[in-house]
Amino acid sequence: MRKHAFGVVLVLVAFLMVTGCSGGKPNTYTDPSSTISVRSNQEFIIALEANATTGFAWEAVYDESILQLVSQNYVPDEHEEGMVGVGGTDHLRFKALKTGKTEIELTYKQPWVEGEGEYDQHLTFKVEIK
């Protein structure tokens, strides 16, 4: 009986170690005043309010030797069927490639407008990779 209980405990500990070490869901950040702190090879998401129906989108400028943009997708807010012009959230998923400090400069703009548009918005997120 003791051997059986020990085996069960051993399997449970092994399971917890494996699941505890699997990265899980990446952290999501929305506040540019807080520094994003991640480990090398870790992914994170910056989620920002947006409204794709206006033609505006978030454009990211970042150091490609330190960060990789894995994906960018827009998710509209829940709304009644048939509604148009509904806002949503733009999710920019990054992967930290190596240790260091960097910034992600984000501009909310209409891509076809040359130079600075009247309604453009700018945000800067600081990133520290350990």
Predicted regions and their residues:
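N-terminal edge beta-strand
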Residues: S22-I46
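C-terminal motif of bacterial Sec signal peptides marking the signal peptidase cleavage site
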Residues: M17-G20
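Aromatic sugar-binding surface patches on proteins
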Residues: V84-H91
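Short, solvent-exposed loop/linker segments at beta-strand-coil boundaries, enriched for Pro/Gly
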Residues: T54-G55, Y62-H79
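Glycine-centered tight-turn and secondary-structure capping sites
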Residues: F94-I104
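Bacterial N-terminal signal peptides that target proteins for export
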Residues: M1-V8
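Beta-sandwich strand segments
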Residues: V113-Q121
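Interdomain boundary/hinge segments at the C-termini of tandem beta-sandwich modules
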Residues: V127-I129
